Amino acid sequence: WSIGEFNPDNLQTSCGMDFGFSIDPDSLTEVAIDKKHKKIYLKEHIYQNGLKSQELAKIVLDKVGQSLIIADSAEPRLIADLKHAGVNIKPVKKGTIESGITRMQDYHLIVSPESTNIAKELNNYIFSDKASKLYVDNYNHAIDGIRYNVIYHLDNPNAGKYFVQ
């Protein structure tokens, strides 16, 4: 991965979101996937603890408007609350952590300079047991949201495209 300008080619973007609350932060990352050049551009918008549903919805709408957000399916009530508040959000079928990370590793990640928490996570995300490919459940909040977005778009190649017949 490297630090660089976010989405210099004006690719279609969407967001990945992981939910937290007291100990873990809510994270929202804007993602642009360049399949041709095998690059994923990342821009951090939210990395904050303790947000209530209404506060989170307001910040999300202020930061990314109606951009599609792919989020952790483990929080259906929060997803429903955010949808009710006007957020364009969909749950993802997560699959394994390993499969999502493997998909991400097929691409060069480019992190915008202001995305310090993403950079910190990428520098510290490690295996707890390399043989079994288990990851330490730490430094993974933005990474999880990014992983949800990448899984959604790479497993649904027509996501976000419209066809006229």
Give, region by region, the residue ranges found by the protein language model.
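Mg2+-dependent endonuclease catalytic cores in nucleic-acid-processing enzymes, primarily RNase H-like
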Residues: T29-Y135, Y162-Q165
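Short, well-ordered loop/turn elements at secondary-structure boundaries
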Residues: D9-L11, S22-P25, K63-G65, Q105
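Structural motif
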Residues: Y135-H141
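ATPase catalytic-site recognition across NTP-hydrolyzing enzymes
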Residues: W1-M17
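Acidic two-metal-ion nuclease catalytic site recognized across multiple nuclease folds
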Residues: H153-Q165
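Stable alpha-helical structural segments in soluble proteins, enriched in small hydrophobic residues
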Residues: H141-H153
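Oxyanion-binding "anion nests"
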Residues: C15-E30, L42
